[in-house]
Amino acid sequence: MAALSGGGGGGAEPGQALFNGDMEPEAGAGAGAAASSAADPAIPEEVWNIKQMIKLTQEHIEALLDKFGGEHNPPSIYLEAYEEYTSKLDALQQREQQLLESLGNGTDFSVSSSASMDTVTSSSSSSLSVLPSSLSVFQNPTDVARSNPKSPQKPIVRVFLPNKQRTVVPARCGVTVRDSLKKALMMRGLIPECCAVYRIQDGEKKPIGWDTDISWLTGEELHVEVLENVPLTTHNFVRKTFFTLAFCDFCRKLLFQGFRCQTCGYKFHQRCSTEVPLMCVNYDQLDLLFVSKFFEHHPIPQEEASLAETALTSGSSPSAPASDSIGPQILTSPSPSKSIPIPQPFRPADEDHRNQFGQRDRSSSAPNVHINTIEPVNIDDLIRDQGFRGDGGSTTGLSATPPASLPGSLTNVKALQKSPGPQRERKSSSSSEDRNRMKTLGRRDSSDDWEIPDGQITVGQRIGSGSFGTVYKGKWHGDVAVKMLNVTAPTPQQLQAFKNEVGVLRKTRHVNILLFMGYSTKPQLAIVTQWCEGSSLYHHLHIIETKFEMIKLIDIARQTAQGMDYLHAKSIIHRDLKSNNIFLHEDLTVKIGDFGLATVKSRWSGSHQFEQLSGSILWMAPEVIRMQDKNPYSFQSDVYAFGIVLYELMTGQLPYSNINNRDQIIFMVGRGYLSPDLSKVRSNCPKAMKRLMAECLKKKRDERPLFPQILASIELLARSLPKIHRSASEPSLNRAGFQTEDFSLYACASPKTPIQAGGYGAFPVH
């Protein structure tokens, strides 16, 4: 403290120089007055000691300002010390004033005290001038003491809200502006994302961030304004009678006759009209606004942008995958899991499904098993709340026990009404146990539910093998197909990537897709799918040489295109589409298997993934064979493989059957010198199918159509084929399954319907 300068006065005695070694003339004058006052025997010694403590505290405050005053974000220990010294100074000054008033000679000492305080003001003005404007929390302790010496003001911030409203929030250290104003905005039907906050500085409004520490703005005035492009309007209320089950968005009670806003959908009773939020926000347009802003700040990669542009020019666009499977992907539809925080009391219940009876379209005969008297709970929010909530603050407990023992079930609600005292105690302890259990378990990956433990699958005979694994017939709650993947000792990066892709595969449900049933990691990575009783398309065409009619071949092509269109709509690239992976049931239903799994179909070196040329080269697109891009696989590469499958269907042969050199095929196809010979197609092949085959086998990737267009072309072709219609005069009994001998039971004679033709001879003919 030897460097402390600009003190509030040191005194004439040698002991007083200890507090301030560099005494200025003004400070000396003030100290001289204090010393003369102290020399007066009528002044109690306590007052003199308090004045010395005041001076010492002021010097400490000045030292803190000199050391940390110029920093924009000072350390927290400095803020704590500054607050401690200012509080101590205020208490000493109050004590001094009380003593002077009780002695009746407060005038003389007020002058000396004022001189001392003025010294602090003048000496620390340079330190205060270098403070940033955002550090207005460092107020001059002199001004605080003079304005209200007996009751120091709490740090607050005045906020002017939209629609000529205002509020006051406390300025707590470590709390952001967003957290401080969130409740006030929610009460008015607003969220921080649709507003901007400004501070008044030098008569001008300057925007600040929502994540700014509110303690830096102590004593200032903030203005919150709604963004210009936010669709904010006034309510458009109409009287409405709700014939379907509806609830008031304020009191959550049954609503039959009331009012509804045509813009935001807010419903309420007439008695609840005073609690309706003043602001009307069209959340549908607001969601689109936030999504557009997201794409502005998170641009789509160039490869995906070109892919989307190609899809749009071809008249279709691949849909995005499900939300829980993509994580950071860009092309995801925002509807499944909206990241936009919507205020609970003001979002219409039938729009965001938070009401107690979620309304949804369903069959009138289907039982409404969704009816529940407990509001749906987001598990992530519940775990977070359970982590910070005390034992007595829990309102709804959730345990890992069966539904019958849930604390929020109907049974417990009735028991709570009968005996509120004991039930409240049991509920508190139950929630405490659940909270501890949730902390122990942590966050659980949903893909773990699809992992089949080791030993539950009985592996049977070997069916076949390929580039990526070996297929076995197995038993797991029935017949299944088990594909043991050629990945030995997977690294953590491989295993995590494998689980991420499994998270996508487990959501595939389509009539032309093999049903994914689970996966196994021990003793090695394996995929479990449904068992297909039929044979593969390759076996039908090239092994047993089944002779299909043209109408059947076109239907097989249609089903294959339909299944691939579904996979691409889920943003799943097959990467290995061929006739070996297309299975036919006995009724000629197509099932596509071995799709996705880019992790397995790649070469790994440590934690880095590289694409490799593996699999069946006959179905590989030229860009895949060249391997010039980091990831040559795309929707169009699957289209090329589908074109080869069409070639197999329409010719009954494999392409390049006249070339026996594998390396020659790789070189010529990759360079674009070799294409399948379309002159070998069957004579009865429609010209439209031949044209479609040629388009799918284009050498340039961007010139190939996508599966929505391919499927539409095949369906149009199937409808245009001539068909033999059933004769309208054919008896319908034969179609019903009656046999010829069944009619003998009813062969009884009738005068109205004679059976034997000879009977007509008995009647005379005139």
From Swiss-Prot:
Its EC number is 2.7.11.1. The keyword Glycosyltransferase does not apply. Changing G464V: In a colorectal cancer cell line; elevated kinase activity; efficiently induces cell transformation. Changing K88E: Reduces interaction with KSR1 and MAP2K1 and thus phosphorylation of MAP2K1. Binds 2 Zn(2+) ions per subunit. Its cofactor is Zn(2+). Residues 155-227 form the RBD domain. Pfam families: C1_1, PK_Tyr_Ser-Thr, RBD. Residues 1-13 have a biased composition (Gly residues). Signal peptide: none annotated. PROSITE patterns: PROTEIN_KINASE_ATP (PS00107), PROTEIN_KINASE_DOM (PS50011), PROTEIN_KINASE_ST (PS00108), RBD (PS50898), ZF_DAG_PE_1 (PS00479), ZF_DAG_PE_2 (PS50081). It is linked to Defects in BRAF are found in a wide range of cancers. Colorectal cancer: A complex disease characterized by malignant lesions arising from the inner wall of the large intestine (the colon) and the rectum. Genetic alterations are often associated with progression from premalignant lesion (adenoma) to invasive adenocarcinoma. Risk factors for cancer of the colon and rectum include colon polyps, long-standing ulcerative colitis, and genetic family history. Belongs to the protein kinase superfamily. TKL Ser/Thr protein kinase family. RAF subfamily. This is Serine/threonine-protein kinase B-raf. The lineage of its organism: Eukaryota, Metazoa, Chordata, Craniata, Vertebrata. The gene is BRAF.
